[in-house]
Amino acid sequence: MTVDEFWDWSLARYSDHSTRDYLLTLQTKLDLVVLEALFAMWLGSRHREWEEGAADRLGKATQRWLEAVVSPLRETRVRWRSDPTLQTAREHLLTLEVQAERHLAELIWDAVMGSSDVTTDVVYRPEIATAELMTVNVGRIPLFRDGKYVSERTQMVVLLDQAT
């Protein structure tokens, strides 16, 4: 398993229009970090279960990058959507945003898979179905803990499990 495999899997899933639209809706409504959710799902697709400690490390490792780089790029690109004179600039921002997201994937990878706790925080579970592992893993993201947003989490698993 490598960060490149995770990134390629994420891009393939994100290229599906219904999946992308749903993830972007959750990003807007719930402040979901799409790539964090995709990482949780990707681990499940690889029959890996992660513990809350790994999800917490991920959040700490990515927060500054998200706040300082990814979110401002996205917000500016969205704000410029209605101005046709800024179309070329918007396309450039989108390229920068994808590059920033790629770096975010590396931060996620390093926080979880590069940790000395990886052997206890990410466990191989070949006996558990992919959809179940995806559900468990997404449920460990702070946004979805304590039974929050169960229907949204379930729909996300359905969309991504079908594509796996």
Which residue stretches match the model-derived regions?
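An acidic intrinsically disordered interaction segment
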Residues: 1-16, 68-78, 99
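Short acidic alpha-helical/loop segments enriched in Asp/Glu that coordinate divalent cations
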Residues: 50-56, 74-82
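A charged, amphipathic interaction segment
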Residues: 78-164
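Residue-level detector of well-ordered alpha-helical segments, enriched
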Residues: 22, 31-38, 69-72, 89-92, ...
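Short amphipathic alpha-helical segments and their helix-coil junctions
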Residues: 6-28, 113
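N-terminal interaction modules that seed assembly of large macromolecular complexes
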Residues: 20-63
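Short, mixed-charge aromatic SLiMs
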Residues: 57-72, 130-138
